[in-house]
A protein has these predicted regions:
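Core beta-strand elements of the Rossmann-like FAD/NAD(P) dinucleotide-binding domain
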Residues: 3-5, 189-196
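N-terminal Rossmann-like FAD-binding beta1-loop-alpha1 element of flavoenzymes
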Residues: 7-30
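Short hydrophobic core segments
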Residues: 10, 194-202
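Alpha-helix C-terminal capping segments
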Residues: 21-26, 201, 227-228
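Conserved N-terminal/central alpha/beta ligand/cofactor-binding core
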Residues: 28, 33-178, 183-189, 207
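Extended, hydrophobic alpha-helical segments in both membrane/secreted and soluble proteins
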Residues: 198, 218-225
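Flavin (primarily FAD) binding-site architecture
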Residues: 205-211
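Conserved small/polar residues in nucleotide/adenosyl-binding loops
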Residues: 229-234
């Protein structure tokens, strides 16, 4: 079966669901989850989310410096700056979608200070921030009329020009993505999902190791799928 959407989102953690919510006003979204929506690394994150919220005592430069030091200066500075400077706006988005960060008696964020941070800038929900974020985003995507959630199915291959009969290898220039093949493991059936935009938000690889605190779904299959069409670094 061939299904057509404006956006195909593969992965249902904070990255996948927040992207789906941001673009849903522009068209139909398919959100693919290889297990249940609750099972993602996001759900198991406890401490909180770091963001500059009080410019009287904190600033972006401090946060950027703290992050670079904690990463032993091997972090991509451009990426660090982007994440730090855009964090407050993303926090507002999470709140808009229903995330309830703890506040003090003054109605201000109850900020914590964690390892590597020079200031109090950790927003949290008790000690289960990830679960609060995941649960809130699940409710938001489930009530959005333009988002269709497909659980217990997963991507096995992305669609490139080979879908049009063109031979595609790692060396093919200007490889384009047209969607993905999605497998239903219960039936063994593979459906073709076509989309104008495809986002891979499949998380990490923790579960490929013998010892990990990651959930079993963190197998890195999304990374492996994309590597099929990525030229190795010189």
């Amino acid at each position: 079966m061939v299904r057509k959407f404006d956006f195909l989102v593969i992965g249902s953690g904070i990255a996948g669901m927040s992207f789906a919510l941001k673009v849903a006003h522009k068209g139909k979204v398919a959100l693919i989850c290889k297990s249940g929506l609750e099972e993602a690394n996001t759900y198991f994150a406890q401490g909180g989310v770091a963001s500059v919220t009080n410019l009287l005592v904190d600033n972006f430069d401090k946060h950027i410096e703290d992050t670079m030091i904690a990463g032993d200066w091997i972090s991509d500075r451009g990426a660090v700056e982007k994440v730090v400077r855009e964090a407050p706006a993303q926090i507002e988005e999470l709140i808009k979608w229903g995330v309830d960060f703890d506040k003090n008696e003054k109605g201000e964020f109850d900020l914590h200070r964690e390892g590597g941070h020079s200031e109090f800038r950790i927003l949290h929900h008790k000690d289960n921030t990830g679960a609060e974020i995941q649960d809130s985003l699940i409710k938001a995507v489930q009530r959005h009329p333009n988002i269709e959630v497909i659980e217990n199915q997963f991507a096995v291959e992305i669609l490139t020009q080979h879908h049009l009969g063109v031979t595609v290898t790692r060396q093919t220039p200007d490889i384009k993505c047209y969607g993905a093949y999605i497998l239903d493991p219960k039936t063994g059936k593979v459906d073709t999902y076509l989309a104008k935009v495809t986002l891979m938000a499949t998380g990490g690889v923790g579960a490929v190791y013998k010892t990990t605190t990651n959930p079993l779904v963190a197998t890195g299959d999304g990374i492996a799928i994309c590597l099929l069409y990525t030229s190795p670094s010189p």
